[in-house]
Amino acid sequence: MNVYLIVKAKVPKNIVNEFDEWYQKYHLSDAHFSFKSLKAFRCWINENEHHAYYKFKNIDIANNVIKGKSLEKMVKTFDKKWQGQVTRSRELIEIIQEV
């Protein structure tokens, strides 16, 4: 079954618009390309919690991304842009059933 890497970000309210524009124009597509994900999409939860989802065929592929240079590169890009203003976490979820 498919696996999703979920990146959750807490964005200060005063930079939500700037963050949203940057993620839309640059980061989502760059990460999708870099990770070689099957699909990538994002959403907002409440006013300032952003989630990005990257879909992979299986857990092994997703784990390789988590441990690999592509994630390291994207983290550096993110950190350079947001200078510690945005906190984030990552988790993998493995789909076990679909209807």
Where are these regions (language model features)?
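Active-site-flanking beta-strand signature of metal-NTP-handling nucleotidyl enzymes
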Residues: 2-9, 51-52
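Residue-level signal for secondary-structure boundary sites
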Residues: 15, 60-62, 98
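Short acidic/glycine-enriched loop/turn segments that link adjacent beta-strands
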Residues: 46-50
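Short, low-order "capping/linker" segments at domain edges
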Residues: 92-99
